[in-house]
């Protein structure tokens, strides 16, 4: 009898402990997370959809998306601990931060090649016509500048030799207006703004996706110290973004995605977001591994202008432990 009572009591304790743990897990407050994109295009649509559709909340996250004016300011926030993640590309800013001592790594990659529309003035017909012209960028050393340098490298153009100058203009919308106003000869824009310019006569010199240039485009970057201390937060952010990709790629959700993209890009009409929506469906990958080749390509181009980048190794800039875990568990 005593043995039976002891056995029942032991089982009750185990059940009670398990129930208490389960309740505690459910009741635990969501982790507060700040993600800072520094680009204003469809690339960031994955974040907006995840927010609007409640995927971050689903994975116990309280996420604040803060659009930064440029990558240097975004990295200042990351360095100061005011944000936990940067959503963006390999650039002089992101790689330069590591060179200068930031313990940063790319934990996932969502677009792993160079993309965007190189929109130009009506007088530009070929890449050689860009010689002697002024090209608009969001910042020197930032992602948009890096896109431009990789395109020039592909076309055999050298800004110094060919007298091509850069003018810091601002985000995609402002650069589009500057092309139409004749302030600059061209700039790499998001597909939505490039398509809208094309409708009024300003050509797209090239769809950079067609050039198949390896590049770490949209990716999630964080500090190693944060990853080591809070791997569960990183995992939950990636789970939410995988949910977002699945949602975007389902045609059943087209209207909801268009609504989110229209809101994000501050467009007057939903119809103006269609090109950006089609881009999002095609170019996001569910195999969200960062690309070593793409990061290596960025290091190569940056090393042409500054030798300090030559000491970087692409492999050291990646920590894909969470992505590997997710793949093992069948998340993609």
Where in the sequence are the language-model features?
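Short, low-complexity disordered leader/linker segments with a strong preference
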Residues: 1-32, 332
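Short, glycine-/small- and polar/acidic-enriched structural segments
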Residues: 25-171, 175-181, 185-191, 204-214
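Hydrophobic alpha-helix position signal
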Residues: 50, 56, 97, 152, ...
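Short amphipathic alpha-helical segments at helix boundaries and their inter-helical linkers
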Residues: 83, 87, 280-294, 325-331
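Pocket-lining segment of extracytoplasmic ligand-binding domains
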Residues: 92, 173-265
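Secondary-structure end/capping motifs
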Residues: 228-310
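Conserved C-terminal helix/tail region of periplasmic/extracytoplasmic solute-binding proteins
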Residues: 299-332
